[in-house]
């Protein structure tokens, strides 16, 4: 049992996950963040030599990544994690902050995403089972996800809800195709005794990509949006609004006005978006413009990362093109030859 390898892997991943969650609050260059980065680097420095020394008994045999399909599929899963987790999780927030939708309306947009994912997984599974080919499905899947995120980068406050739903459905179809087929070349390339390890490594790459995407893309979005909002709140036109009797006399505006006048306008607490419910449209306009710009900047790099994954899928090899190592092939002259053909499975 590779206890030391498991401990080193935890020492590598856990500090990075903590920074991914808290980095925007602490600051990426804060002492706490830098200390955790250093701790994660130390964990990686211990993990690699330990795993190399353990060989096939390692918790993550690094020799697996010498097989092109396993390394490539892990890289593609990483790009999917970055692009999807870093953007899909923000769609409800986009609908609330930019389009003024209610939390219920914003949450319902996840339904077409799930429907597209489930339907495309079922279809792609049947196609692979009947033909044994997956490369075209992977290309279409990654291309669809990249196209959907780039399309999201063009949306704004006036985009109709049906347009958002179509893009989200398109995104769901793409991820359903990709998730189903991306494991096929990896499983075909891995030794039978290490299929579970290969699957786990690929899934881990996707989770790391998701954490990275959430941390980086969220930080980019908030930095752009709140920086722009701070500038807009200090324009002479907006400062006049803060003293307009029609604005100050409306109780619905009071919480927002208190925040703006205290100099915290760029620090809107997005854990409680009720602050923005019912406020005057003139007060809301800078918030909408700022976050629309921030979301555009976030969706664009997410789409670019998925385009990189799309390019990688062109290098996947079909099942028929993969050949297992000689020692992994079943012996044709062994038990099977002596005892006759194995009975067909009822499955």
From Swiss-Prot:
SUPFAM superfamilies to which the protein is assigned, alphabetical: MFS general substrate transporter (SSF103473)
Subcellular location: Cell membrane
Membrane topology listed for this record: Multi-pass membrane protein
Region (Disordered): 321-347
Main localization (coarse): membrane
Top-level taxon of the source organism: Bacteria
Pfam family, one: MFS_1
The keyword Transport is assigned to this record: yes
GO BP field: proton transmembrane transport; response to antibiotic
Tagged with keyword Lyase: no
InterPro entries to which the protein is assigned, alphabetical: MFS, MFS_trans_sf
Keywords: Antibiotic resistance, Antiport, Cell membrane, Hydrogen ion transport, Ion transport, Membrane, Plasmid, Transmembrane, Transmembrane helix, Transport
Record Gene3D superfamilies: MFS general substrate transporter like domains (1.20.1250.20)
Transmembrane segments: 3-20, 30-52, 73-95, 108-130, 137-156, 161-183, 204-226, 294-316
Cellular component terms (Gene Ontology): plasma membrane
Gene Ontology molecular function, alphabetical: antiporter activity
Family of the protein in this entry: Belongs to the major facilitator superfamily. TCR/Tet family.
PANTHER family: COMD (PTHR23501:SF197), MAJOR FACILITATOR SUPERFAMILY (PTHR23501)
Function, as annotated: Resistance to tetracycline by an active tetracycline efflux. This is an energy-dependent process that decreases the accumulation of the antibiotic in whole cells. This protein functions as a metal-tetracycline/H(+) antiporter.
Annotated protein name in UniProt: Tetracycline resistance determinant
Species annotation: Streptomyces rimosus
Lineage, top ranks: Bacteria, Bacillati, Actinomycetota, Actinomycetes, Kitasatosporales
Gene this protein is translated from: tetB
């Amino acid at each position: 049992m590779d206890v030391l390898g498991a401990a080193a892997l935890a020492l590598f991943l856990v500090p990075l996950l903590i920074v991914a969650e808290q980095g925007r609050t602490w600051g990426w260059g804060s002492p706490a963040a830098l200390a955790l980065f250093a701790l994660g680097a130390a964990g990686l420095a211990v993990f690699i030599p330990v795993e190399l020394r353990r060989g096939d008994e390692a918790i993550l045999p690094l020799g697996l990544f010498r097989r092109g399909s396993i390394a490539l599929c892990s890289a593609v899963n990483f790009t999917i994690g970055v692009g999807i987790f870093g953007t899909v999780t923000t769609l409800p927030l986009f609908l609330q902050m930019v389009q003024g939708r209610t939390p219920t309306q914003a949450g319902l947009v996840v339904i077409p995403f799930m429907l597209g994912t489930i339907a495309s997984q079922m279809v792609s599974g049947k196609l692979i089972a009947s033909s044994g080919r997956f490369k075209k499905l992977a290309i279409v899947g990654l291309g669809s996800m990249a196209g959907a995120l780039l399309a999201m980068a063009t949306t704004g406050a006036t985009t109709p809800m049906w347009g958002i739903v179509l893009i989200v459905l398109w995104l769901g179809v793409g991820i359903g195709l990709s998730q189903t087929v991306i494991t096929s070349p990896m499983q075909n390339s891995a030794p039978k005794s290490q299929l579970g390890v290969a699957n786990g490594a690929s899934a881990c790459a996707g989770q790391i990509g998701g954490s990275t995407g959430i941390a980086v893309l969220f930080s980019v979005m908030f930095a752009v949006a709140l920086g722009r909002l701070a500038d807009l709140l200090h324009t002479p036109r907006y400062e006049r609004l803060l003293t307009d009797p029609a604005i100050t006399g409306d109780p619905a505006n009071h919480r927002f006005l208190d925040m703006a006048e205290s100099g915290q306008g760029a620090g809107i607490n997005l854990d409680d978006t009720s602050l923005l419910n019912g406020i005057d449209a003139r007060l809301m306009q800078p918030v909408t413009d700022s976050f629309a710009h921030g979301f555009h900047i976030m969706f664009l790099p997410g789409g670019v990362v998925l385009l990189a994954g799309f390019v990688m899928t062109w290098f996947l090899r079909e099942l028929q093109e993969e050949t297992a190592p000689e020692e992994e092939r079943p012996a044709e002259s062994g038990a099977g030859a002596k005892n006759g053909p194995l009975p067909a499975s009822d499955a």
